[in-house]
């Protein structure tokens, strides 16, 4: 499996994961031997820690917490421990400030996740959680689906960060953080970039295999664990307890490297992958005819914006009421009657109002409405404005959600909003976004406009979500929000050209 780049992300938070090539699974001793090629020749017995102790504890705790809560449940998920050699190998690579997986000779025996950001502080745990959040795009392959290869089903740009984190037999981790004065990230030079590298052993992401076995937790642990289980993870007490670290003594010994013979495995046969289906474009605006009734077309959530054709003024379609129109009325002729459209057609927004006791006739703008003295569902019409925005405007600023519904203008976005930094133009979520997100940068993330040309979009404010999951799409990395305190959400849609 090769490493995949999800597109250019010039600013903000980025993530990658290394795919597995599936050649061998040597032990940590080989890892040490390979690592020695990247260490300085000077003889010294002690080296500085590559990551603060509190960050190390956060990374390890979060990995084990996430591994223990996978769904469907895992029967053979092993408890993960920290490995100093993996930490040193991660530090050696992070110090190179090269935005790619490496070194090449080490990747045959370890898994690797990379993250980078600049600007405001991000803890290592933020990166780890964002890697795990790819679970939303991953579908677990059950044994009945593996014949003999398990299908690879990832509906997002990448799921291999997640699968490496929850690979059952990966039980060692070591990470490092390095601040790079300058680092080239997909063609863009970042200054003071924070580079986060995590190395894993044994490596995961083997092609055609599920990341873990499904079943009752700890029911299929390796015999070496002796039947012990902790928080749904196969667990054994470590015989070696490291000495407590202090700020003055935050160092580790460099152990000698013993000689050892290694058994090499034959390369695995890789199945050809099928091209992924492209998702259909969603539109909020529905194209209707002069005789389209509101009750016939208004179904579902995208029931508030319609494109009316020209020539409806003299059409025979009926409308009932004044101000409040009965649901069997023509949408377009009601808009002309109210005065927001003329015979040239155009956009109209609908607001549903529930039942009213009766509807009174009137003649307005050349259209005669009828009376109906019978309780029925009703709706109102309103004019759609078109508004030019910059790359920073949010739905919270423009048209926040209010019950029963809020109508936003049709928005014209400028080009190149993807290039704006996340602290000025953040994006939170996937598919449904927090209303503190940049509207136009969100439109690029959602794929409804091109970054190079910009364009028109429709937005629909909705009530808030409990969580927002970040993802990398169309070169934009959106962020996750676990417990948003305030604010609502919105959906974003393409506009028919």
Swiss-Prot record:
Secretion signal, residue range per the UniProt entry: 1-22
PROSITE patterns referenced in this protein's UniProt entry, alphabetically: CRISP_2, LCCL
Pfam families: CAP, LCCL
UniProt keyword annotation of Secreted present: yes
Stretches assigned to the LCCL domain: 284-379, 385-488
Keyword Disulfide bond: yes
GO CC annotations, alphabetized: extracellular exosome; extracellular matrix; extracellular region; extracellular space; ficolin-1-rich granule lumen; secretory granule lumen; transport vesicle
Subunit-level organization: Binds to heparin, dermatan sulfate and chondroitin sulfate.
Name of the protein in question: Cysteine-rich secretory protein LCCL domain-containing 2
């Amino acid at each position: 499996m090769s490493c995949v780049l999800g597109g250019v992300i010039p600013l903000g938070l980025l993530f990658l994961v290394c795919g597995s090539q599936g050649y061998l699974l040597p032990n940590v001793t080989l890892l040490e031997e390979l690592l020695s090629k990247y260490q300085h020749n000077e003889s010294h017995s002690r080296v500085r820690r590559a990551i603060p102790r509190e960050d190390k504890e956060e990374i390890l705790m979060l990995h084990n917490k996430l591994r223990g809560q996978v769904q469907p449940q895992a029967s053979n998920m092993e408890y993960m421990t920290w490995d100093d050699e993996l930490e040193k190998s991660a530090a050696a690579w992070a110090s190179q400030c090269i935005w790619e997986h490496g070194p090449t000779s080490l990747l045959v025996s370890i898994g690797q996740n990379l993250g980078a950001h600049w600007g405001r502080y991000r803890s290592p745990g933020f990166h780890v959680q964002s890697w795990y959040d790819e679970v939303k795009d991953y579908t677990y392959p059950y044994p009945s689906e593996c014949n003999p290869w398990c299908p690879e089903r990832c509906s997002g740009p990448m799921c291999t960060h997640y699968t490496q984190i929850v690979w059952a037999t990966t039980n060692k981790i070591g990470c490092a953080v390095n601040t790079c004065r300058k680092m080239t990230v997909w063609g863009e030079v970042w200054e003071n970039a924070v580079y986060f590298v995590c190395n894993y052993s044994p490596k995961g992401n083997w092609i055609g295999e599920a990341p873990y076995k499904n079943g009752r937790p700890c029911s299929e642990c390796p015999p070496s664990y002796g039947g012990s289980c902790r928080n749904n993870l196969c667990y054994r007490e470590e015989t070696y307890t490291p000495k407590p670290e202090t700020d003055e003594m935050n160092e580790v010994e460099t152990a000698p490297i013993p000689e050892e013979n290694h058994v090499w495995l034959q390369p695995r046969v890789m199945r050809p992958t099928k091209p992924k289906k492209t998702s259909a474009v969603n539109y909020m605006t529905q194209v209707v005819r002069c005789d389209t009734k509101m009750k016939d077309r208004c179904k579902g959530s995208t029931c508030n914006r319609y494109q009316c054709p020209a020539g409806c003024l003299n059409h025979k379609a009926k409308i009932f009421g004044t101000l409040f129109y009965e649901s069997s009325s023509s949408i377009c002729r009601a808009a002309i009657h109210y005065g927001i459209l003329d015979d040239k057609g155009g956009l109209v927004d609908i607001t549903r109002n529930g039942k009213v006791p009766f509807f009174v006739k009137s003649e307005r703008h050349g259209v005669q409405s009828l009376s109906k003295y019978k309780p029925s569902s009703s709706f109102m019409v309103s004019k759609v404005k078109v508004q030019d925005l910059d790359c920073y405007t949010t739905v919270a600023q423009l048209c926040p959600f209010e019950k029963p519904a809020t109508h936003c203008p049709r928005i014209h976005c400028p080009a190149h909003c993807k290039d704006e930094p996340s602290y000025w133009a953040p994006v939170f979520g996937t598919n449904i976004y927090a209303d503190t997100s940049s509207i136009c940068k969100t439109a690029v993330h959602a794929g409804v406009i091109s970054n190079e040309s910009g364009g028109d979009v429709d937005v629909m404010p909705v009530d808030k979500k409990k969580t927002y999951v970040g993802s990398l799409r169309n070169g934009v990395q959106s962020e996750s929000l676990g417990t948003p305190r305030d604010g609502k959400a919105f959906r974003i849609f393409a506009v028919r050209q």
